[in-house]
């Protein structure tokens, strides 16, 4: 099964920020929700193929098959091509990828909780 091959971290600042955005149906730069350096992020959800996740990470994050973690999404943050964090977060963010300019914005506002997606301003 697609259980994590590594211990997935947890970032209270990221979780709290995502929760606030979802609760208030507002957006923010993802970089403002983190306190570590990164230049690219990948977000994966339950059921995403292990091969895609491991390829994006450049290392084995998920054993095989598909990512299996109930109500969790996986954030992989990289800096200069190397993974600096692999974090679990509430499954309120749609899968996607972006750089430090990417914003987290409401994807839908009803029903609650609000789901979020990665978007670029003016693109």
Report residues per predicted region.
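Mature extracytoplasmic domains of secretory-pathway proteins
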Residues: 22-88, 92
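N-terminal, charge-rich interaction modules
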Residues: 2-33
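Extended hydrophobic/Leu-rich segments
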Residues: 8, 30, 53, 116-119
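Long, low-complexity intrinsically disordered regions enriched in Ser/Thr/Pro/Gly
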Residues: 15, 27, 35, 109-113, ...
